[in-house]
Amino acid sequence: MVWLWTLPWTFILVALIPLATAKSPDVHHSLQQLKKRDDDSLRDENCQAWIAPVWPGMSHMMVAATRAERDVSYNVSIDQLTYKGAELTPLVFNKYGYTQDGIFKSMDLLKSGMTSLGLDVYWNNKEQYWQLCPVIFPSSAEPGTPVLLQRRLTTDIVTCDQNATLSYFLAALSNHVNVTDNNLDVDLISLKLNLRTVETPIQSNSSSQRQKRQFRETSTSVTQLASSVLSSLLNASKTTRMESTGSFSNSDSNSSSNSSRMSNSTESTRTTSSTESASSTSTTPSTYTTGPQMLGNIVGSSYIGPRLYTPKDLHRDREAEPPRTYDYQGLSNRGFPLAHYILLEMKARVMVSISQNDQPDGYGWGSADQDVIFTKQALLGSSDPENTNENIAYENLQECIRLDPQFLQSINLTGAASWRTYSSTQQDPISNVSFQEFINCGLSPSINNTLAPGETLQGLMTESLWSWAEDEPSKCHNESVTRTQDRNTGLVAWNCAVLMPDGWHVANCYDTHYPLCRQGELAYNWAVGTQKVNYFDTAQEKNICPPGYTFSLPRTALQNIAAKITVRGVSGKTRVYKGGDTTDPDSYDTIDYGNTAFPVWIDLNSISQEDCWVSGGPTARCPYRTVQSHSVSVALLTVASAVCAGVAAAIILLQMDTQPIKKNSGRWRRLMSNFKKSEYESVPA
């Protein structure tokens, strides 16, 4: 009998072990009732840490905002995404030199949120290799020792190191890809190459010797550090770091072949003879179609090679049945694949394209280049990356910035264009304000100018999102903005998003707003809902949207602009179609939207888990889960096992403790028998 009683408890304890060892996510943390405070404010002790700037890198707030914007754009073709770009020559190399330290600073731009880098590469026709330094190295230059060289075209003095090669840059880029190769941080990087011809230095070898001695003393520690970091880069590229449960890793075959690829490319890109004079010239063939010196071979055989999305991949995806590419009308064999497909299925991370081609002397574009690097030429009837005019300027850009309804008349033509880019110049520089405006209007700006005094890349990157407004998604809210009816019940949940004229804001899910609705699959056709509801009621079938419309959210910058313009045009008493015969007056309702319909709900929330913004209604689940360390799991399992062992020991001891035999049991039975005899068996008189 004791075992029958203990058996259910044993099963219960066994079932509790997995619960004890798993770290429960912070689900519905913000849905708890808010305690009233005397200062009538909701203060988050982590508020300052949430918004604190980080460099290189992003604040916790920017990380959450960038991830949310990336996630809602997963089902968008890659040519419709906005890329934050920077030209490395004016922003990095002019300041830090063409050195290994300069390459590390370039990777810092990617950590801060940049997704497009412009790199100048110079063809040395005499030595037959590509280099990052714009000037030919003198014969007396030693690898690892920076030298000062003067350019002929601009007369600028540049600092160059022979160890800072194109292969080294690609290895550093591969290391960044490995570090961010997880579901939380993965993104698509665009590497735009500008093909130039190397210049002959102005100064003589004797002056170069003096400058070399001047630099040698100060550069020794930097060279040693750079060499050790290069070794770590190459080692890190062989084993992919796992940072989340959805981490990606290269296949074993790719990892095993990378070492030989890197060594071959390094040897092939450097054929310089230290005994030859820098001023000597040689005649070489003007066109190459094969060989290790080809730019495509250098890029393809580098450590980043297995993570490239190439023209050959695009051709294969377009020729598939059905095609895996999309244009503005849907499936098309002339479009581009979705971001989700490239990042999560193909596990590709980098696209290399030619932004500017100065036709370097002695170098011809060959088949090896065309298979790896995208060009501006048309391919299979469609445009390749960067196949738009540099310095593109919309005639209606001001209409977009002003949220002018006239912009909707041309937005479909604008959305049909691929790879919409804008590159600044020193004469027409990009500032913090214009950077934000270009991104909001669906352009991918590239900074090709030095920043003005008072402007920093960190300040510029805080204005680099088309989705969230400034300082959003915020954890610092004031309870005074909560509606009166919500204050009476204390129901506050800052886990839902609304659309405002300046972008997305975090709002209380229990507030009532009109929902934002989209017409079918039409990207730029939006409408305001027909009734005010709290966010949780958007999942109910209450006809909250006009017929043919559903509750949704913008997934691109142009969709966001179209939604803003639509909502801004709704105010006062408005006739809204509710279904039926369009000629019947009874098929319309009159809704009073007041002075403005803003704010409106969008299909975005972090209800399932804090800081994890997902679409799909209030019941949508976060696709990421918290990964805890092995030591924590062992500790929790030890505690659970100890509790189970203690309970089991107690059960065994109770079973062994049987009822003792009473020695006077016979006497007790005799007393009970005599007592029964003395009782009457009938009713007494």
Swiss-Prot record:
Keyword line: Glycoprotein, Membrane, Signal, Transmembrane, Transmembrane helix
Transmembrane segments annotated in the record for this chain: 634-654
Topology feature Cytoplasmic, residues: 655-685
InterPro entries: Telomere_Capping_Maintenance
Main subcellular localisation: membrane
Protein family (similarity comment): Belongs to the MTC6 family.
Name of protein: Maintenance of telomere capping protein 6
Organism: Yarrowia lipolytica (strain CLIB 122 / E 150)
Taxonomic classification: Eukaryota, Fungi, Dikarya, Ascomycota, Saccharomycotina
